Amino acid sequence: MARSRFGRALARVLRRHRLARGLSQEALAEAAGVHRNYVGLVERGELAPTAENAKRIADALKTPLATIISEAEKS
């Protein structure tokens, strides 16, 4: 469960990056090789992504994972 403060911040950052790129959850999921429901769970802060899936999502967003983590830590 990702309901920690960092988990919620990570969820907001991922959603913000997805929307900024004009991607639907489905399009992001397809690009990252994960299920659309997985993206939704992560974005709602209900599930913490594995390190591998976080990297896949960041790559699909064309954003370094370190940038996403840094933004989440600052929020």
What do the PLM-derived regions correspond to, one by one?
Residues 12-31, 56:
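Short basic helix-loop element that most often maps to the first helix and adjoining turn
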Residues 14, 28-29, 39-42, 68:
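Conserved hydrophobic/aromatic packing and binding residues within compact polymer-binding modules
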Residues 33-47:
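Recognition helix of helix-turn-helix/homeodomain-like DNA-binding domains
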Residues 67-75:
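Short amphipathic recognition helices of helix-turn-helix/homeodomain-type DNA-binding modules
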